[in-house]
Curated annotation (Swiss-Prot):
Role: Catalyzes the hydrolysis of phosphatidylcholine with phospholipase A1 activity. May act as an allergen and induce hemolytic activity.
Descriptive protein name: Phospholipase A1 4
Gene3D superfamilies assigned: alpha/beta hydrolase (3.40.50.1820)
Keyword hit for Translocase: no
Entry keyword set: Allergen, Cytolysis, Disulfide bond, Hemolysis, Hydrolase, Lipid degradation, Lipid metabolism, Secreted, Signal
Positions of the propeptide segment: 5-14
Entry-linked InterPro entries: AB_hydrolase_fold, Allerg_PlipaseA1, Lipase, Lipase_N, TAG_lipase
Organism of origin: Polistes dominula (European paper wasp)
Bridged cysteine pairs (disulfide): C20-C103, C192-C197, C235-C240, C257-C284, C258-C309, C277-C282
GO annotation, biological process: killing of cells of another organism; lipid catabolic process
């Protein structure tokens, strides 16, 4: 998972600035389906030249995953999410691996001097994802209503840039963007054109889990503040809380429980009790959030261990 902790704490390694230069040719696509559970690696150029996707695959819902700083497209948490999407909902999952642009080669040194480069690269990766989406729509006849993006940290903002670009390309809007603890550093005062924003898809869902490494303002149609969005149970490091957003969504995809969000106006107000929840006032985190009418900010109580349920057995 990506780790912005040393950046936020100001404990930068004063070594040589890493080279995290973006090059589209470095991007790989990890493609998962029920008959390719461990994933295959493709390049966009190959997709242009060969009819690789079978009609039976491409007709499914498609989830495009985008990782964050210092991470990879097949990181452990994304791999678990991809397998859950395949198993439960028979998705076609495409994980965008932009590890070089995300400075993954320097992850072992914990050198975050390349963070500003990675931030700049998010726009390039967003354009890449939009161009890939155009290929899916025009060559493979995939409707935009079948495509959702799921991005963690810098990947959340990258998803936003992709959402803006597909609209510029006149493709319409993605069905949904799910922003998993959208990155805070370099985005703390950003306006909509420069970050993930609720207009970037038909529905934008944000799951906030770290006030240190993530943004603490609303960016979506619904914004879930898990455990008040500050830090997470069982986590002593901000990076642990930051990564929990990915794990929470994966458990919600498995549908072992519903993480319920109850309306919450601000950090200084007391959220309503889960026991008072009705389907028209509260929202379940996850792939079905869009089916609930309520929008805005929601407080989500969680337990320390998976599947993290703290919903008093309530069914919405």
């Amino acid at each position: 998972a990506d780790d912005l902790t040393t950046l936020r704490n100001g404990t930068l390694d004063r070594g040589i600035t890493p080279d995290c230069t973006f090059n589209e040719k470095d991007i790989e696509l990890h493609v998962y389906s029920r008959d390719k559970r461990n994933g295959i690696i493709l390049k966009k150029e190959i997709l242009k030249n060969y009819d690789l996707f079978q009609k039976s695959q491409i007709s499914h819902q498609i989830a495009i995953l985008i990782h964050g700083f210092l991470s990879t497209g097949n990181n452990e948490n994304f791999d678990a999410m991809a397998k859950a999407l395949i198993e439960i909902d028979n998705f076609l999952v495409i994980s965008v691996d932009w590890k070089k642009g995300a400075c993954n080669a320097f992850a072992s040194t914990n050198d975050v001097l390349g963070y500003s480069q990675a931030v700049g690269n998010t726009r390039h990766v967003g354009k890449y994802v939009a161009d890939f989406t155009k290929l899916l729509v025009e060559q493979y006849k995939v409707p935009m209503s079948n495509i959702r993006l799921i991005g963690h940290s810098l990947g959340a903002h990258t998803s936003g840039f992709a959402g803006k670009e597909v609209q510029r390309l006149k493709l319409g809007k993605y069905k949904e963007i799910i922003g998993l603890d959208p990155a805070g550093p370099s985005f703390l005062t950003s306006k909509c054109p420069d970050r993930l924003c609720e207009t970037d898809a038909e529905y934008v869902q944000a799951i906030h889990t770290s006030a240190i490494l993530g943004v603490y303002y609303n960016v979506g149609s619904v914004d879930f503040y898990v455990n008040y969005g500050k830090s997470q149970p069982g986590c002593s490091e901000p990076s642990c809380s930051h990564t929990k957003a990915v794990k929470y969504l994966t458990e919600c995809i498995k549908r072992e429980c519903c993480l319920i969000g109850t309306p919450w106006k601000s950090y200084f107000s007391t959220p309503k009790s889960i026991s008072q929840c009705k389907r028209d006032t509260c929202v379940c985190v996850g792939l079905n959030a869009q089916s609930y009418p309520a929008k805005g900010s929601f407080y989500v109580p969680v337990e320390k261990d998976a599947p993290y349920c703290h919903n008093e057995g309530i069914k919405l």
